[in-house]
Amino acid sequence: KLQYDLDGTIDMGLKMLPETKSVYILNDFSSGNAELASRLKHKYRDLGVNIVYLTPNKYSTAQMLSKISAMPEKSFLLFANWNRDENQVVVRIHNLLNKIIDTCPKPIFTVNEKVLNYCALGGVVAQSERHGVAVGHLVEKILTGVTSPSSPVQISDTEKIVYFDRQRKYGLSLKPGQLEVQWRNIPKGIFISPYEWAAIIIGAIMILALMAYLTLMWN
């Protein structure tokens, strides 16, 4: 199965929301999830953050929505995966996301590319084509006996992405430079790139040089 960067995404959320006390995670119930949940709970408990791990084998979709509607202050949601309900019926992702948006008043982070593009504030994600390449490599290793079918797919080529314009909904106003992330939907004029700064500086130097030259000519 794909092994997403939950730690990195939680850390991103904590940097953006340093007063966070609880993180609610939605994930599937594949093998290894119990160990993952235990590790995350132990790791972030030491940092004063409570991890609430919700999976479809313990909660129906309706129960999950009820849980996240009552999330405490100073918390955020991390959507990893929720593609089936308690009866193993496939859940349509966009329908579910619309319900989550209507239900959850807290910031949403994700490791899922579709969720990021649709509604999340930010996350550490790998593009879908990179997932495909990683899965292909794993299948090749399984077929050649190099690894076992239960081995997770390691996704190392990820991107930290935050949607600038979605901050307002949650009362945030972080600026480019405060986070080492790829910002999306930045309004023009908010951020000047290093190349633009270089052009401005060069232009200013040329103007000053011209003014100095004209002053010498007049004198």
Mark where each language-model region is.
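Hydrophobic alpha-helical segments within soluble ligand-binding/sensing domains
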Residues: 1-20, 127-144
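Membrane-proximal low-complexity regions enriched in glycine and acidic/polar residues
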Residues: 34, 39-42, 48-150
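Beta-strand-rich non-transmembrane domains
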Residues: 103, 151-160
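Juxtamembrane amphipathic/hinge helix adjacent to a transmembrane helix
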Residues: 157-191
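Alpha-helical transmembrane signal-anchor helices
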Residues: 186-219
